[in-house]
Amino acid sequence: MKLLQEKLSKYDAPQRAMAAGIYPYFRMIESDQDTEVMISGKKVLMFGSNAYLGLTNHPKVKEAAIDAIKKYGTGCAGSRFLNGTLDLHIQLEKRLAEFVGKEDAIVYSTGFQVNLGVVSCLTGREDYIIWDELDHASIIEGHRLSFSTKLKYKHNDMESLEKQLQKCEPDKVKLIVIDGVFSMEGDIAKLPEIVALAKKYNASIMVDEAHGLGVLGDHGRGTCNHFGVTDDVDLIMGTFSKSLASIGGFIASDKETINYLRHNSRSYIFSASNTPAATAAAGAALDIMLSEPERIEHLWKLTHYALDGFRNMGCEIGHISTPIIPLFIRNNDLTFLIVKELFEAGIFVNPVVSPAVAPEDTLIRFSLMATHTIEQLDYALEAIHKVFKSHGLVK
């Protein structure tokens, strides 16, 4: 065995979970992505999706994707920088910039590539990137590629953020990069306070709206719009794989920043462009988001109903007010076991365990879609109560 394979063979955590019968990953879905899915011939309720508006199976979204394939084919066979820019891309960029309140935007092939390519290239060796300790992995990978000084602050802790800003040289660029809605715990960044500190220390702000878009703000414009700080935030990032029912991502900002990124963001320049189908699907989902605000209203009705149900049950969920609801278990193996038992009861949820979070912070991520019904939610709450009670997590 070569040294590389010998080293990698020592990683056996998945095999141990499989042997214990609690391995929860790569469950093969055999149906469309809706509130009910088929997995290994078993119908289960989906409470693990990021499709907050439930648009992945919407007829208009699918029709837009099919029409784009008929006109443009299945791919662009090149990067946006060269032969991969379609009129579809340009049109969507203009619409997204207007939607989030910025001058211009760039569409990337994935949301991960946005953060990777933007965070890594905006600041130089003498500059600073300041980030929340619970930022998404794509933000972390982005600043790892940067030559700037990286300063981490405690999650949503404004005193900690200010201490890090005080370490920075006043005349150097300081970029604060944060999730608008944090993807694991579902809590919201303290944007008004962050904006105030950014003004005090002459720092710039980039907000990842992956989980805020389609959920918060006017017609789902996101966390920045929700707090009324769009003009104070320098860059707004979004993804298509959640509320926009597709695959891809974008960054929106002023024209000067977007011009720089178009010519310097390596994950944009050296990646094949987003497919016609994915681009058109995202555009159609944006149309629906604007024309059917009742979807967001129903999503929030479900969210409040679920939060009340979990709190009345005695679940530990923290101070959460979004459709991403963390059910804290605080034990890796028990989290895996409960996910398995809930699946057997017909409920699909996602485990969040170390190293994604600290071992003492493991949780089950319960997420809602606008297409869920109260009846489906009642069934899930009852099943969760039964399983949690059997493990002494609730009374």
Task: Label each region the model flagged.
Residues 6-74, 203:
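N-terminal "arm"/small-domain region of PLP-dependent enzymes with the aminotransferase-like
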Residues 59, 63-67, 71, 94, ...:
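PLP-dependent enzyme catalytic core of the Aspartate aminotransferase-like
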Residues 63, 67-111:
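Conserved N-terminal alpha-helix of the aminotransferase class I/II PLP-enzyme fold
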Residues 118-137:
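Conserved PLP-anchoring active-site segment centered on the Schiff-base-forming lysine
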Residues 151, 155-207:
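Active-site phosphate-binding strand-loop segment of PLP-dependent enzymes
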Residues 201-204, 211, 216-321:
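Active-site C-terminal subdomain of aminotransferase-like
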Residues 297-306, 311-346, 356, 360-361, ...:
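Conserved PLP-binding catalytic core of the aspartate aminotransferase-like
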